[in-house]
């Protein structure tokens, strides 16, 4: 049995993401045959006792023809209006087709804020887990109607990766109009299908294939989603939506991304992939070694600079002196306190500021180390599409 077949066939919980272009017609509106084929394939999987979360795009592309508009809206307000119309139409069709298999569906609309706030993150998990436990098929989409440019995922690929982590899925399947990852643009005569990816960071491929005319995602976002999922221990398959039955049966089609790590504790999932860092803490080389080689906590003595306006309990990015991202963590002190404490030994802090000040700036159990190199922006209003931390 191949790795891909074993990963898919052995998965008790699957997250399946399907893009707009695989659900709707080129001019907008539901492609009934393709939606029905997808639902039929998923229903067969559910019938044998496996759990499926469907992350579905397509609300905007479904909605704008119903509003009498001939082209996909370009303004945020236009897109939100189309989404409000299309989401109901799309869900109704899903509900009808799943009902023909004796299954119920539940709509789950999420925004970035739902997954960057710990309380909302836990509530989202509880809702999805309850639906799955009741035998209901959760259909997840970004809440385009209320999301603004500053607080939106912008694509459902990364949302699907977060949902896969959230529900502790054993596999993530990304379905679109692209049948696999290629070494070059698929139209190029030199393009070769990449069958298996061991480590995304070592890939040498051209990802500049734009998203379809009815969706927002492209190959770059799919690779980012695959990175997020595999670094959380979730295997990923990227394939064409028309190949969904084969993918679900474990047939080695598309591109298979092997997981890179064991699963993180649930408390770290939010921090690693969903949290928005509120500041940056720069540390010296000794502290970098202590964190990365000995998995130590971050002490004040190793801090050299502080950026941003964070409070105790906020997520922050940990940077090396050369700007490399070391990881993320939950600060135990505010930015003002860390500025005063930086470079001081624990003994000095205890003597001069009291025992509480000698605590770790970031405890090792509230820290996720990174494989990434690029620094993240520091702002309370930064977009969620910044660099992700992967352990």
Curated annotation (Swiss-Prot):
Catalytic activity: L-glutamate + ATP = L-glutamyl 5-phosphate + ADP
Main location: cytoplasm
Ranges where the PUA domain occurs: 278-356
Ranges for region Disordered: 370-391
InterPro entries: AceGlu_kinase-like_sf, Asp/Glu/Uridylate_kinase, G5K_ProB, Glu/AcGlu_kinase, Glu_5kinase, Glu_5kinase/COase_Synthase, Glutamate_5-kinase_CS, PUA
Subcellular localization(s) per the UniProt record: Cytoplasm
Binding, substrate: 57, 144, 156
Keyword terms, alphabetized: Amino-acid biosynthesis, ATP-binding, Cytoplasm, Kinase, Nucleotide-binding, Proline biosynthesis, Transferase
Domain of life: Bacteria
UniProt key word ATP-binding: yes
Pfam family, one: PUA
Biased composition (Polar residues): 378-391
Pathway the protein takes part in: Amino-acid biosynthesis; L-proline biosynthesis; L-glutamate 5-semialdehyde from L-glutamate: step 1/2
Alphabetical GO biological process terms: L-proline biosynthetic process
UniProt GO MF annotations: ATP binding; glutamate 5-kinase activity; RNA binding
Binding residue positions for ATP: 17, 176-177, 216-222
EC number(s) from the headed UniProt entry: 2.7.2.11
Family: Belongs to the glutamate 5-kinase family.
Protein's recorded name: Glutamate 5-kinase
Source organism of this protein record: Cutibacterium acnes (strain DSM 16379 / KPA171202)
Lineage: Bacteria, Bacillati, Actinomycetota, Actinomycetes, Propionibacteriales
């Amino acid at each position: 049995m191949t790795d891909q077949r074993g990963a898919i066939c052995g998965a008790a919980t699957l997250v399946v993401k399907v893009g707009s272009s695989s659900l709707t017609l080129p001019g907008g509106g539901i492609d009934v045959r393709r939606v029905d084929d997808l639902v039929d394939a998923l229903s067969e999987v559910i019938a044998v006792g496996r759990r499926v979360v469907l992350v579905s795009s397509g609300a905007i592309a479904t909605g704008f023809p119903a509003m009498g508009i001939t082209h996909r809206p370009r303004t945020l307000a236009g897109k939100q209006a189309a989404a409000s119309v299309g989401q109901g139409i799309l869900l109704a069709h899903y509900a009808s087709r799943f009902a023909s298999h004796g299954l119920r569906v539940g709509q789950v609309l999420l925004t970035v804020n739902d997954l960057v706030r710990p309380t909302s993150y836990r509530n989202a998990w509880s809702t999805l887990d309850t639906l799955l436990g009741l035998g209901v098929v959760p259909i997840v989409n970004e809440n385009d109607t209320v999301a603004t440019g500053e607080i939106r995922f912008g694509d459902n690929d990364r949302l699907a990766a977060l949902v896969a982590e959230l529900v502790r899925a054993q596999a993530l399947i990304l379905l679109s109009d692209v049948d696999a990852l290629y070494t070059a643009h698929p139209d190029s005569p030199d393009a070769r299908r990449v069958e298996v990816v061991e480590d995304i960071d070592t890939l040498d491929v051209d990802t500049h294939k734009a998203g379809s005319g009815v969706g927002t995602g492209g190959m770059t976002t799919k690779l980012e989603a695959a990175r997020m999922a595999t670094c959380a221990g979730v295997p990923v398959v990227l394939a064409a939506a028309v190949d969904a039955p084969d993918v679900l049966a474990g047939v080695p089609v598309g591109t298979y991304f092997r997981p890179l790590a064991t699963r993180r504790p649930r408390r770290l999932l939010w921090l690693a992939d969903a949290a928005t860092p509120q500041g940056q803490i720069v540390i010296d080389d000794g502290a970098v070694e202590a964190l990365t080689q000995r998995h130590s906590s971050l002490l004040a003595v190793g801090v050299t600079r502080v950026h941003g306006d964070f409070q105790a309990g906020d997520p922050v990015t940990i940077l090396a002196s050369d700007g490399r991202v070391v990881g993320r963590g939950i600060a135990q002190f505010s930015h003002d306190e860390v500025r005063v404490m930086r470079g001081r030994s624990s003994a000095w802090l205890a003597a001069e500021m009291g025992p509480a000040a000698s605590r770790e700036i970031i405890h090792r159990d509230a820290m996720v180390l990174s494989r990434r190199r690029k620094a993240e922006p520091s702002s309370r209003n930064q977009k969620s599409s910044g660099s992700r931390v992967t352990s």
